[in-house]
A protein has these predicted regions:
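Long terminal segments
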Residues: 20-73, 125-183
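Amphipathic N-proximal alpha-helical interface segments
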Residues: 71-93
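A short glycine-rich beta-turn/N-cap micro-motif
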Residues: 84-89, 111-114, 137-143
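Mid-length scaffold segments of soluble, non-membrane domains
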Residues: 88-116
């Protein structure tokens, strides 16, 4: 009896892990398809199915006191259908300050919630310092990696929250620019 219970529990655990990784795999596939779609937009011109809003802070590269070189450029890729409000699908931000560069990419579901967030912090010379990936389903984190290595649940809370906050800030920025900031 105990052996069959143990086998059943082990089977359920394996099934749950497989289902979760399948969801992560689906998010990866969706992200790759979306990036392919975005890459094709310039060739599609007015027949493209997405729009792109670009916010470029300090494009002339002026220096900030105490910081030095600073620039932030964000591309928001979104859909519009009829009279419905725009739906953000992907935000891509490059932020340079002093000798550091942070690139953030966030993919959103149809309800405006982040489903995948990638954050890469590098030095100006291009040397990677930290890469973080967060996979979400609704409000639940499915997986979080640091430099392509899974991070144990108990150790990832603050880093995972920081990555999620970047994606949340980007969607709020988009809604603010598009006139939907109170949602």
């Amino acid at each position: 009896m105990r052996k069959s219970t143990l086998v059943a529990l082990l089977s359920l655990a394996i099934l749950a892990a497989f289902a979760q990784s399948k969801t992560v795999e689906q998010i990866r596939a969706d992200y790759n398809a979306l990036k392919t779609e975005v890459a094709r937009l310039p060739q599609m011109k007015e027949t493209g199915i997405m729009y792109c809003l670009i916010v470029d802070d300090n494009p002339q590269g002026a220096t900030y006191p105490g910081i030095g070189h600073f620039r932030s450029k964000t591309h928001f890729y979104y859909d519009v259908a009829g009279d419905e409000p725009p739906v953000l699908r992907l935000a891509v931000e490059s932020y340079e300050s002093g000798t550091q560069r942070t690139d953030t990419e966030a993919m959103y579901d149809e309800r405006g919630r982040a489903s995948f967030v990638f954050v890469s912090q590098r030095t100006v010379e291009g040397q990677p310092v930290v890469e973080q990936r967060l996979y979400m389903e609704g409000d639940s984190a499915l997986d979080f990696t640091l430099n392509k290595i899974g991070v144990a649940e108990g150790l990832r809370a603050q880093s995972q929250r920081d990555v999620w906050m970047k994606a949340n800030r980007l969607v709020k920025q988009f809604l603010s620019v598009m006139g939907g900031g109170d949602e």
